[in-house]
């Protein structure tokens, strides 16, 4: 079991939560990015640098993730592909994507893309709040408890 991080867009504060969690859980954590990343020394944490380009990091995460893994991403199509492979997917605001919710999120994403393409300003997400960080940590812990229960 591995935690995969779409690291180019992942907020630093979320990475810090993940570093601590990887140590505590003794779980491999792989940060995939198209640039060099500084991570704390750990036998559980590593980086995987990929070539720059559209969806290169996403495609690498999809290629390597397996059923039971966790993918941290705000990218809806990446989350959908991870779920299709049997992995769990969580965004940096603590929202866990599920097979039931991912279709709705994909539809909304496509709708917003259409609005932007037609020149309508849709704005971006609010900045990450303390509540978001707490929700992320809580959902990560919930996932970890599910993993432990499934191991028996």
UniProtKB/Swiss-Prot annotation:
Q: What is this protein called?
A: UPF0178 protein YaiI
Q: What family is this protein classified in?
A: Belongs to the UPF0178 family.
Q: Which CDD domains match?
A: PIN_YqxD-like
Against NCBIfam families, the record matches this protein to: PRK00124.1
Origin organism is: Shigella flexneri
> Which Pfam families does this chain map to?
DUF188
Q: Which residues form the signal peptide?
A: none
Q: Which gene encodes it?
A: yaiI
Name the domain of life this protein comes from. Answer: Bacteria
């Amino acid at each position: 079991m591995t935690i995969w991080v779409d690291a180019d867009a992942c907020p630093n504060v979320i990475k810090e939560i993940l570093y601590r969690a990887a140590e505590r859980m003794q779980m491999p954590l792989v940060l995939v990015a198209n640039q060099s990343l500084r991570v704390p020394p750990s036998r559980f944490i590593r980086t995987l640098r990929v070539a720059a380009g559209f969806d290169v990091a996403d495609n690498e995460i999809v290629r390597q993730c397996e059923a039971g893994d966790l993918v941290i991403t705000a990218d809806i199509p990446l989350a959908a592909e991870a779920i299709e492979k049997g992995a769990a997917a969580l965004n940096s605001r603590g929202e866990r994507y599920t097979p039931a919710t991912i279709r709705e999120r994909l539809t909304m994403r496509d709708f917003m893309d259409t609005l932007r393409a037609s020149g309508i300003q849709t704005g971006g997400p609010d900045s990450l709040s303390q509540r978001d960080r707490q929700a992320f940590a809580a959902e990560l812990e919930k996932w970890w408890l599910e993993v432990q229960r499934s191991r028996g």
